[in-house]
A protein has these predicted regions:
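Alpha-helical transmembrane segments in multi-pass membrane proteins
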Residues: 67-75, 95, 99-103, 107, ...
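The first (N-terminal) embedded transmembrane alpha-helix
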Residues: 36-49, 67-70
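Short, highly charged, low-complexity non-transmembrane loops/tails of multi-pass membrane proteins
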Residues: 230-237
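Cytoplasmic-side transmembrane-helix entry/capping segments in multi-pass membrane proteins
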Residues: 62-70, 93-97, 118-129, 153, ...
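Helix-coil boundary and interhelical linker segments in multi-pass alpha-helical membrane proteins
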Residues: 26-34, 81-91, 136-149, 194-205
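C-terminal ends of transmembrane helices
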Residues: 47-57, 80, 105-118, 163-174, ...
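Structural signature of hydrophobic alpha-helical transmembrane segments
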Residues: 31-43, 88-102, 146-158
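Ordered, amphipathic secondary-structure segments that act as subunit-interaction surfaces
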Residues: 102-139
C-alpha cells in the first residue's frame, strides 16, 4: 500500500493535465514506432550535416566523427543531465554512437555528391527538430515537471545539439541567427502540450505537433521567414 501511495502523482499535477490521470498514462496508447523512426532518421541526418560543418573547418576524420556524435546526441544528453534523467540515451543504446559515427564517415566519402541532396537534408533536419522537441517534452512530462520546464526540455533536445556543433566549429550558432529554428521548436512543444491539455490522446497530439512544426519550418525555409534582428553599433568613438 505504501509503495502504491508513493507511485501516485502529486494531486497538484493533476490540474496540469486534466485529460489524464497520470503523466505515464498519456503515452500508453501511443505506439513508439513513429517517434523512434523519426529519431533514427534525425540523428543520422544531424550527424551528416555536422560532418559537413566539420569538413568546412578542415578537421580530421576523428574530429568529424566527434562533431557528428555531439551534434546528433548532444541535445538529449544535455537535457538528461539538466533534468537528472539517467542513464543517458547513448549509454543505454551505444549503437547510436556507431550509427552517427558511421554516418559521418559515409558523408566524408560521398562529400562531392552531397550538394545534390541539400533539399533532402533540409527536410530531414526539419523532421529531426520537431521529433527531438516532442521527445524532449515527453521526457519531462514523464518526470511530472511543470509546463515551463517541459517546453524548455523540448527546446533543449531539439536545438542544443546544433548549438554545440556551431560552437565547436567556431561559428555563430544557428539558434542565435535570424532563421526560425528555436521558435519552431517552441511552437511545436506548445502545440503538443496544448493538444494534450484539451483532452486529445497522444496518438492525435504527436502527429498534430509534428505536422504543424514541420510545416512552419519548411515554410520558413521556402519564404525566408526571419526573426527581427537587433543591430547595435557603437559610434561613440
Amino acid at each position: 500500500m505504501r509503495a502504491q501511495a508513493m507511485a501516485r502523482p502529486p494531486a497538484r499535477l493533476n490540474t496540469m493535465w486534466p485529460a489524464q490521470a497520470t503523466a505515464r498514462a498519456m503515452f500508453t496508447d501511443l505506439s513508439p514506432a513513429l517517434l523512434h523512426t523519426l529519431y533514427l532518421v534525425a540523428i543520422v541526418a544531424e550527424a551528416m550535416t555536422a560532418a559537413l560543418s566539420a569538413g568546412r573547418r578542415d578537421m580530421d576524420w576523428m574530429g568529424v566523427c566527434i562533431i557528428a556524435c555531439v551534434t546528433a546526441l548532444g541535445g538529449g544528453s544535455l537535457r538528461d543531465v539538466l533534468l537528472g534523467h539517467y542513464p543517458l540515451t547513448w549509454v543505454v543504446h551505444p549503437e547510436y554512437l556507431w550509427m552517427t559515427g558511421g554516418a559521418a564517415i559515409l558523408t566524408a566519402l560521398i562529400a562531392p555528391v552531397m550538394r545534390r541532396l541539400r533539399s533532402v537534408f533540409l527536410l530531414a533536419d526539419a523532421l529531426g527538430l520537431v521529433a527531438f522537441t516532442v521527445i524532449g517534452c515527453q521526457v519531462a512530462q514523464m518526470m511530472q515537471l511543470p509546463i515551463t520546464v517541459v517546453l524548455i526540455s523540448g527546446m533543449i533536445t531539439g536545438c542544443a545539439g546544433g548549438v554545440l556543433r556551431d560552437v565547436l566549429c567556431n561559428e555563430v550558432p544557428l539558434l542565435f541567427r535570424k532563421e526560425l529554428y528555436a521558435s519552431v521548436s517552441l511552437v511545436t512543444g506548445a502545440l503538443y502540450l496544448g493538444s494534450m491539455s484539451l483532452g486529445l490522446s497522444a496518438n492525435a497530439s504527436v502527429p498534430i505537433a509534428l505536422a504543424a512544426g514541420l510545416t512552419m519550418r519548411l515554410m520558413a525555409l521556402r519564404f525566408n521567414w526571419q526573426m527581427p534582428k537587433f543591430v547595435y553599433r557603437d559610434d561613440w568613438d
